[in-house]
């Protein structure tokens, strides 16, 4: 099994995230980190259920651990980090594109994983499996405090 960038190893930041180690740039409080952990472990379990292999399990878990790393950051601090196509987006959705950009700057080249993190709040027709899974897991993780009317019965 290979990583989506074609290599047999994960980038060190991705590998660390898959073990629950957040990057230095993370701006997320305790409850947010708990949410990220639940999403990461839910994604790991889904990848395992798919028999995707250890590398894919780690990738999927990392997506969950990384998706909200900048969720508690001030949107005005995130705007300079994001691609110009996101500049008119609401502040609450900038954390995904900003986190993906900081991961790129750190040397992460896994396009599917970066796209998943970048668009996890809005969704994207270009999602790979990890993107689709992250989009669902972020909403469905068991600790999420969403109003009952949004949940299927």
Which positions does each model-derived feature cover?
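Generic N-terminal amphipathic, Lys/Arg-enriched alpha-helix
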Residues: 9-29
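Catalytic cores of the polymerase beta-like nucleotidyltransferase superfamily
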Residues: 5-9, 49
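Alpha-helical protein-protein interaction elements
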Residues: 14-17, 38, 52, 59
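Divalent metal-dependent catalytic cores for phosphoryl transfer on phosphate-bearing substrates
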Residues: 22-27, 34, 44, 49-153
């Amino acid at each position: 099994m290979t990583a989506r960038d074609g290599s047999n190893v994960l980038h060190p930041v991705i590998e660390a995230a898959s073990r629950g180690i957040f990057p230095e740039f993370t701006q997320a409080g305790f409850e947010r980190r708990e949410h990220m952990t639940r999403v990461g472990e839910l994604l790991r379990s889904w990848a395992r259920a798919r028999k995707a292999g250890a590398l894919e399990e780690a990738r999927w878990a990392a997506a969950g651990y990384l998706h909200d790393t900048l969720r508690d950051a001030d949107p005005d601090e995130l705007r300079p980090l994001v691609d110009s196509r996101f500049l008119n987006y609401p502040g609450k959705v900038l954390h995904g594109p900003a986190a993906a950009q900081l991961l790129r700057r750190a040397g992460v080249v896994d396009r599917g994983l970066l796209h998943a993190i970048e668009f996890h709040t809005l969704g994207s027709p270009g999602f790979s499996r990890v993107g689709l899974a992250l989009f669902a897991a972020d909403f469905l993780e068991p600790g999420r405090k969403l109003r009952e009317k949004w949940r299927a019965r």
